[in-house]
Amino acid sequence: MTHQTHAYHMVNPSPWPLTGALSALLLTSGLMMWFHFNNPTLLVLGLLTNLISSYQWWRDIVREGTYQGHHTKVVQKGLRYGMVLFIISEVFFFLGFFWAFYHSSLAPTPELGGCWPPTGISPLNPLEVPLLNTSILLASGVSITWSHHSLMEGNRKQMIQALMITIALGLYFTALQAMEYYESSFTISDGVYGSTFFVATGFHGLHVIIGTTFLITCLLRQLLYHFTSNHHFGFEAAAWYWHFVDVVWLFLYVSIYWWGS
């Protein structure tokens, strides 16, 4: 390694952006093949290659930051800006789903029976599983904050306990959401109501799964003593992402489950 006189991390050539992009292509193509031709082969292949690429890329970043010391204050500042911009892009991503929902529900067309929910649709009761899911995510927001503060105070035991509680709540939320989908009386193909409901809540559910994976990675890293009280951006990014998922759910609950029913 040559001597450098700046604090920036000059990243080595990596194959993971290329394999990640190709796996994303397989994933989206596979999703269309599954929806239209009931053939999940390409989707499974896309999922596997995406998971492998993500794991390898994440592993390299952990090595660079933890063992090679590349994540200086300047690099961490850049990573923070990157995470903030990523979350802003996600806000606009979900904004599109809310736009589609309100566009369809505020002025229902004659094809929908001129009412919302459309004729023939039995919406889910917002005071049952959706309300429980809201409580779970709010509780997980409290526990992730507890975990973060414990880490900053150097309380390793409480940090691990709080993080495990957050992960358990995330898994519980996912299980309840899957049960809700299974028992729902309508599907994604039941007109604009089914489409907007399942796409919006489904993408949120996917974000919960990604966030839970992020937190599990942080738990493993904490068990391996990767984090210190003043050097833990990986965990901080996971906490930001989790809070974003919490806030999106509140808007989904109020809009689609409560007002939309």
UniProtKB/Swiss-Prot annotation:
Domain of life: Eukaryota
Predominant localisation class: mitochondrion
Catalytic reactions of this protein: 4 Fe(II)-[cytochrome c] + O2 + 8 H(+)(in) = 4 Fe(III)-[cytochrome c] + 2 H2O + 4 H(+)(out)
Membrane topology (UniProt): Multi-pass membrane protein
Keywords: Membrane, Mitochondrion, Mitochondrion inner membrane, Translocase, Transmembrane, Transmembrane helix
Subunit structure: Component of the cytochrome c oxidase (complex IV, CIV), a multisubunit enzyme composed of 14 subunits. The complex is composed of a catalytic core of 3 subunits MT-CO1, MT-CO2 and MT-CO3, encoded in the mitochondrial DNA, and 11 supernumerary subunits COX4I, COX5A, COX5B, COX6A, COX6B, COX6C, COX7A, COX7B, COX7C, COX8 and NDUFA4, which are encoded in the nuclear genome.
Protein name (record): Cytochrome c oxidase subunit 3
Keyword Membrane recorded: yes
Locations listed in the record: Mitochondrion inner membrane
Membrane-spanning segments: 16-34, 41-66, 73-105, 129-152, 156-183, 191-223, 233-256
Top-tier EC class: translocase
UniProt gene name: MT-CO3
A Pfam family reported for this protein in Swiss-Prot or TrEMBL: COX3
Purpose: Component of the cytochrome c oxidase, the last enzyme in the mitochondrial electron transport chain which drives oxidative phosphorylation. The respiratory chain contains 3 multisubunit complexes succinate dehydrogenase (complex II, CII), ubiquinol-cytochrome c oxidoreductase (cytochrome b-c1 complex, complex III, CIII) and cytochrome c oxidase (complex IV, CIV), that cooperate to transfer electrons derived from NADH and succinate to molecular oxygen, creating an electrochemical gradient over the inner membrane that drives transmembrane transport and the ATP synthase.
Source organism of the structure: Tachyglossus aculeatus aculeatus (Southeast Australian short-beaked echidna)
UniProt record, GO biological process: mitochondrial electron transport, cytochrome c to oxygen; respiratory chain complex IV assembly
Enzyme Commission designation: 7.1.1.9
InterPro entries in UniProt: Cyt_c/ubiquinol_Oxase_su3, Cyt_c_oxase_su3_dom, Cyt_c_oxidase-like_su3, Cyt_c_oxidase_su3-like_sf, Cyt_c_oxidase_su3_a-hlx
